[in-house]
Design a protein with these regions (language model features):
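Glycine-rich beta-strand-centered segment in the early N-terminal region that forms part
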Residues: 21-38, 50-92
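NAD(P)H dinucleotide-binding glycine-rich loop of Rossmann-like/cofactor-binding domains
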Residues: 33, 45, 78, 84-147, ...
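Short glycine-centered segments of the SAM/dcSAM-binding site in methyltransferase folds
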Residues: 84, 142, 166, 240-241, ...
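Mid-domain Rossmann-like dinucleotide-binding core that forms the NAD(H)/NADP(H) cofactor-binding site
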Residues: 118-194
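NAD(P)H cofactor-binding loop motif with strongest signal on the N-terminal glycine-rich segment
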Residues: 148, 224, 247
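Adenosine-nucleotide cofactor-binding segment
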Residues: 162-227, 281-284
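Glycine-rich phosphate-binding loop and adjacent beta-alpha segment
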Residues: 171, 180, 227-297, 330-332
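C-terminal capping/lid region of NAD(P)-dependent oxidoreductase domains
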Residues: 290, 295-304, 312-332
Length: 332
């Protein structure tokens, strides 16, 4: 089989398309013929050895896939060869075939494309866990979403509206603002590009405060980090919940007096660990996502597709934060 492999730490330019023996499923596993693989920010980090998961090299990046079952390992029940599935793999998805634990796979509805399926799990499962379990989001509350036109950002916007929140989208361009509005955001605010000095931080904080209104944001969803985090935190409501989802702009440092003054919570969101520790709760969330998908309340936005040999370009686009929605690699 063909696979796009990382042989050494580095950027997308270090990836090489190689031939490997076909993998075989072990006990409790399925072999999936990959038809589509979504690109996410962890793919940027994992090939540079900057992610918490560090697979032995050589390895293929690609953390979520859609495809068809080609073979079934011992003890697997409920699946047959040819079934259409989606799964989060962590890595290994940028290959023609990948072995997946059967318990980690979900059935892809026949009416949905492989491209859509590959773009669903990681971003939407992260966002529903963040908003409901960590953020305790309630109908009528105000949700501020940073980076609202990215994969997890658009998912948070759609889910916020599905749960009847007032959603304020914060983005870096008018094009991204329109994408957030199209996803259902009640309002969108365009913030300048960082980094910021102290005066710039004050301007940014005021921008967020004006966007959410005098009562503040009940929940703030932050997949951006960097200088945006503190500025956003200053717009939080009394007893609000600030969700740390990611930090492509850098790991933020917060003055903790702000949390005291607002009596607010700063909550980390590590969906992968949650799914491993509480698989039943995660499976329930995924079933909810499928229901919302069928109802048309959520819909993964795939802005571009790439062939396997050009997957490095997709990873670079994610790294440079040029993407609206999701990028998907299609594998024929």
């Amino acid at each position: 089989m063909r696979a796009l492999l990382s042989h050494e730490p580095g950027g997308p330019e270090t990836l090489r398309l190689d031939e490997l023996p076909d993998p075989e499923p072990g006990s409790g596993e399925i072999l999936v013929r990959v038809r589509a693989a979504a690109i996410n920010f962890p793919d940027v980090l994992i090939i540079e050895d900057k992610y918490q998961l560090k697979p032995p090299r050589p390895f293929a990046p690609g953390g979520e896939i859609a495809g068809e079952i080609e073979a079934i390992g011992e003890g697997v029940q409920g699946w047959t060869v040819g079934d259409r599935v989606i799964a989060v793999t962590g890595f290994g998805g940028l290959a023609e075939k990948v072995v997946v634990p059967a318990r980690a796979a979900y059935r892809l509805p026949e009416e949905r494309s492989f491209e859509e399926g590959a773009a669903l799990l990681l971003t939407y499962a992260t966002s529903i866990h963040a908003l409901l379990d960590r953020g305790k989001l309630q109908a009528g509350q105000t949700l501020l979403v940073l980076g609202a036109a990215g994969g997890v950002g658009l998912a948070a916007v759609e889910l916020g509206k599905a749960y009847e929140a007032r959603v304020i989208a914060a983005v870096s361009s008018e094009e991204k603002a329109q994408a957030a509005r199209d996803a259902g955001a009640d309002e969108a605010v365009v913030y300048p590009q960082g980094p910021f000095d102290k005066d710039g931080q004050k301007v940014l904080a005021q921008l967020f405060k004006e966007a959410v209104g005098p009562a503040g944001a009940d929940v703030i969803y932050d997949p951006v980090g960097g200088d945006y985090t503190e500025a956003a935190l200053r717009s939080i409501a009394w007893e609000g919940r600030f969700l740390v989802v990611g930090f492509p702009a850098g790991i933020a440092k917060l003055p903790l007096n702000l949390t005291l003054l607002k009596s607010c919570d700063v909550c980390g969101v590590f969906w992968g660990a949650f799914a491993a520790r509480d698989p039943k709760a995660n499976a329930a969330h995924v079933e909810t996502l499928f229901k919302l998908w069928r109802q048309g309340m959520i819909s993964p936005k795939v802005s571009a597709t790439y062939p396997l040999e050009r997957a490095g370009e997709a990873i670079r686009a994610i790294a440079e934060r040029r993407v609206i929605g999701k990028l998907v690699v299609t594998i024929d």
